[in-house]
């Protein structure tokens, strides 16, 4: 969907997702000498398009940048053209015609923001073990809508494959869910006091223990703090410190989602996952080349996949302890934790 006017047909243009009409407007705006700087919306008829000033602001909000616009054609003489060497012409054309598309990871950024906003409205600000586990069903529905929006061919998968993909992804999703928020507030989290940290741990399990099996706050810290320390220091913080840009983070999300190493997937589904992962890896590398990032950054993201997998194993261990202590966890979520996938 065009992030400027809302049109259904959209593609990657000048760094943002837009329809061809808005892309053409954006290009004309910078190549034309006429650049309206004042908003004229109040003087226009009710059903007309927004003025040039407002429309260009929407283009910027969609991520479009004038740096990606090729300069206009100059009127050059035949003599001037003949002076250009064949080698330099070939290199120039090669640089322009090789496409570096990153549509899937670019388009997913906006969808992820909508996904997170929807989750925030449903769950509110309070979070504890029961709320997190209970929300997994809604998270799976929203995740699949996002997947189909970008990879429509997966709508042909059998229900069991769709379900398996989502159930395989949920424990990983819980590991990375807080990474963007953590990255945006990293100084706050680095300087959190001991008392506040312990209070967060206690609040997460408070109220989800049956009255007949309460444990002291001291025991809660003793049992669960090692897990929190692991998630924070071994998973969330290392990824947050990478300062991933939106498309890079979405590449990480999709590489985790389309993990084809599970035995509960059909051969057809595993092949689809394998092919999509190739596309995502290619888009990620292309995006980083366009941004002039160091090549090591690509491999750091691949290493982040291993961090999340380690966090997933630790999380499953924590859930088993919660079950032994009769901490209230959604039964459906515990089925996801228990089932054999490898």
Curated annotation (Swiss-Prot):
Domain called NR LBD: residue spans: 94-341
Residues annotated as signal peptide: none
Keywords from the UniProt entry: DNA-binding, Metal-binding, Nucleus, Receptor, Transcription, Transcription regulation, Zinc, Zinc-finger
DNA-binding region (UniProt annotation): 1-71
Zinc finger (NR C4-type): 2-22, 39-54
Gene Ontology CC entries for this record: nucleus
Compartments (UniProt record): Nucleus
Family, similarity comment: Belongs to the nuclear hormone receptor family.
Name of the protein this chain belongs to: Nuclear hormone receptor family member nhr-150
Organism listed in the record: Caenorhabditis elegans
